[in-house]
């Protein structure tokens, strides 16, 4: 069996055994927080049958909405655009650039809006002028060196004393961003389940019944 088939099989099992007491209503972590509804479900306010596999959210101790991706620490959820099927994430430790360097969403239903080649460089602090347009990744480096992340086509403008640490494709919200530090938030998208028509018509989207993953609207 394929991995995707097994995931769907396990999810259908959860649908069949989900308690009926928890109805599938929109919910949030409190206050003016993110509104959570299908295909997302909010633990523990919703049962798993209220949402799609991989779309489970949770509330932090500070009553903020969070998304836990496979092989990753939780991201804070700042916004969900249900019609465009996009979610805006932020790092709770205010160091998104560090998270992006090792970001991997391949085992989740989400994918980046854009992938851009970035070069990570290690530079001696005394070689970087205060007027430099590049900002160090503040949560990396040490007392003598700083790490920078710039688009690979612009890496040659960095001081020649800087050492290339690695070059890799990184997820960004805008392909025009020069410095990875410009990314205050990370937008991801999802293609399945497709509820765009449902959302544009202001209709409710969800499963047709508890024995299928087919979507109704």
Task: Give names to the regions the model predicted.
Residues 2-217:
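Extracellular/lumenal glycoprotein segments
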